[in-house]
């Protein structure tokens, strides 16, 4: 990752204070356009400030709403903003909330005086103590969200109690080692006979093997409410066609095939489609095929089938990538493939419609960060609408 001087006015290539160069990614279109800052957490870490402060500062300076999903490392500013513009604003943030007024080094630590609601800082480079200008809106955010205090172990290390604890631990360690040495030597067992290889390569190989054998699980006769056997056979044939031809065929060709088989309006076809063209580790896949899924998902039933297909895909691969569930659901939401209402219904309870109830519960638990964020975002939106209505009434 490219790095730059924290103080960009310093041209010294050996300047010790460095940070990642800000990256921006514009997503969506129209009223839903937004700017994502993928490396915000890395930048904030280099500056010694929470990502919340920097993101909110951008929002205040640009007059834009911000969205922060810390669990998924997503920091978003509404509107289209290029990296250069944001980098310039970051310089302003650094001058106002990071640099020491005395030595101009970025080695300051913030502290909050709860009594008078002021923000002061200590410079670890020169020892200067100063106060942050409280006129900027961000100071209110900092006071409400104070930086985490660093734990100090100095007094514990210097105290007699600490020495006694260290001595006790050493004595305990010696006893454990002595008793372990007296234990009889266990018979050596060949680990290769039973151990599960958890290395990254082995996990990837198992996922590929599971996906390769997915054709057997694509038979949808076990889905509730299946139609006649002849129609079910069409889904099987469609799944086999995808297995044989994808990724050699485009989304347009896939849609033409679905129309040819007269299943382009069927929710069960979406379940098959998700399992066949969404590949691990899944992030970015729904955005890649967004136009196709948007064309197919025209009702609540279709949207539920898309989520069901993703659940079944996770089950087929034994939940190996369950940690990406919040990111994938956010991607589905941001590409307008599933509505807020459907996500709310889906998240309300685990269902065994597409997978076992146990698997569904695990997926719902993994999805909790996304579902919580969605509920909070919905509440904020309703609150803003009510405020606008009140303003209109006042006029």
Curated annotation (Swiss-Prot):
Residues 147-157 have a biased composition (Basic residues). Residues 228-384 form the W2 domain. One of its GO terms (molecular function) is GTPase activator activity. One of its GO terms (cellular component) is cytosol. Residues 146-171, 374-395 are annotated as: Disordered. The keyword Protein biosynthesis applies. Keywords: GTP-binding, Initiation factor, Nucleotide-binding, Protein biosynthesis. It comes from the Eukaryota. This is Probable eukaryotic translation initiation factor 5. It comes from Schizosaccharomyces pombe (strain 972 / ATCC 24843) (Fission yeast).
């Amino acid at each position: 990752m490219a790095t730059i001087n924290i103080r960009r006015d310093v041209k010294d290539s050996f300047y010790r204070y460095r940070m990642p160069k800000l990256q921006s990614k514009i997503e969506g279109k129209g009223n839903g356009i937004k700017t994502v800052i993928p490396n915000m957490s890395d930048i904030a870490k280099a500056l010694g400030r929470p990502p919340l402060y920097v993101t909110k500062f951008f929002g205040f300076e640009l007059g834009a709403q911000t969205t922060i999903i810390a669990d998924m490392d997503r920091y978003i500013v509404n509107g289209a903003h290029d990296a250069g513009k944001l980098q310039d604003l970051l310089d302003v943030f650094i001058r106002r909330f990071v640099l020491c007024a005395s030595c101009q080094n970025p080695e300051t630590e913030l502290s909050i005086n709860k009594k008078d609601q002021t923000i002061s800082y200590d410079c670890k480079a020169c020892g200067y103590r100063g106060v942050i200008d409280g006129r900027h809106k961000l100071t209110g955010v900092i006071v409400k969200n104070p930086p985490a205090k660093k734990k100090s172990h100095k007094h514990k290390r210097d105290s007699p109690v600490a020495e006694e604890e260290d001595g006790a631990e050493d004595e305990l360690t010696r006893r454990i080692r002595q008793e372990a040495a007296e234990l009889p030597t266990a018979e050596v067992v060949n680990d290769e006979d039973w151990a599960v290889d958890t290395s990254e390569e082995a996990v990837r190989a198992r996922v590929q093997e599971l996906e390769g054998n997915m054709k057997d699980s694509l038979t949808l006769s076990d889905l509730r409410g299946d139609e006649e056997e002849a129609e079910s056979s069409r889904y099987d044939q469609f799944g086999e066609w995808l297995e044989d031809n994808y990724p050699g065929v485009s989304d347009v060709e896939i849609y033409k095939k679905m129309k040819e088989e007269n299943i382009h309006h069927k929710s069960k076809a979406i379940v098959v489609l998700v399992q066949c063209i969404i590949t691990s580790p899944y992030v970015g896949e729904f955005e890649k095929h967004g136009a196709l899924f948007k064309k197919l998902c025209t009702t609540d039933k279709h949207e539920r089938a898309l989520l069901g297909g993703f659940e079944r895909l996770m089950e087929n691969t034994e939940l190996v990538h369950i940690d990406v569930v919040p990111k994938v659901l956010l991607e589905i939401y941001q590409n307008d493939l599933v509505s807020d209402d459907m996500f709310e219904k889906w998240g309300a309870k685990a269902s065994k419609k597409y997978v076992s109830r146990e698997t569904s519960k695990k997926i719902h638990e993994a999805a909790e960060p996304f579902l919580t964020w969605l509920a909070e975002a919905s509440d904020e939106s309703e609150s803003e609408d009510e405020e606008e209505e009140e303003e209109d009434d006042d006029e």
